[in-house]
Amino acid sequence: RYDNTPVMQAITALRHEQANLVGFRNYAEYALATRMAKSPQDVLEFLHAMVKAARPYAQAELAELEQFANRKLAAWDVGYFAEKLQRERYAVSQEALRPYFPLPRVLAGLFGVIGRLFGVEIIERQGVAVWHPDVRFFDIHQHANVIGSFYLDPYARTNKRSGAWMDDCVGRHALGGELTLPVAYLVCNFLPPATDQPALLTHDDVVTLFHEFGHGLHHLLTRVSYPSIAGINGVSWDAVELPSHFMENFAWH
């Protein structure tokens, strides 16, 4: 009754037919035509190299966790026992780190890093229409000029989509000689602040914020005025995560 196997088989067959119709031998080759990795063999070689490098460390970590748990672990057990081991060995947990990461301080640090890296200044603008009182609006300034803006919607609330993401509100473009500057949405689901207290983030939250801001900067700092290739547009899917992971590094240093 709940077996999706026939549906998946039909999707696979239709994708294969789609690829054949436009001259590719299989759907993998078709999907990679617009990626940095140009062939399935490139992808497999990359994955095999990653496995070769990572497997010894993963096996050692799993053995350590199983020794701690005193039993064999299934995949769904690993996160739970990793957190328990961390608490026992280092007396630390994500929750214990919250007092060190109030959101105002994290934003100040993030904006400071961005300023030093890219020579810009991020300034909040008041009086902009927003869809919820928690939402804030910021301009990015460079050489006394605004070059882009973004909405920041940081907190979880009822009926809000879960997760964290960046999306483009307006892409940079120039039509008829008039330049339109980029605007982005930066959305997270952090624990809301208590009364008269700032929101306190876990370190995982901090990494998430830096990650999504990397996507935002990719969109907002573009100097290209053609919509199809400005910012995140026209970038291969296997390259689009580069700015976000680059920014994550600064959440650790």
Regions found by a protein language model. Give the residues of each.
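A short, flexible low-complexity segment enriched in Lys/Arg and Gly/Pro that occurs
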Residues: 1-9
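Active-site recognition of the HExxH zinc-binding catalytic motif
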Residues: 16-23, 114, 192, 197-223, ...
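Acidic/polar loop patches that form or flank catalytic/metal-binding clefts of enzymes
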Residues: 119-125, 218, 224-230
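Short, motif-level signal for alpha-helix interfacial/capping segments enriched in acidic residues
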Residues: 2, 189, 195
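Short glycine-biased active-site loop of nucleotidyltransferases that positions the nucleotide triphosphate
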Residues: 130, 198, 235-239
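Alpha-helix N-cap/helix-initiation motif
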Residues: 4, 99, 103, 198-206, ...
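Active-site-proximal, well-structured secondary-structure segments within enzyme catalytic domains
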Residues: 9, 14, 18-192, 240, ...
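The catalytic-center signature of Zn2+-dependent metalloproteases
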Residues: 222-247
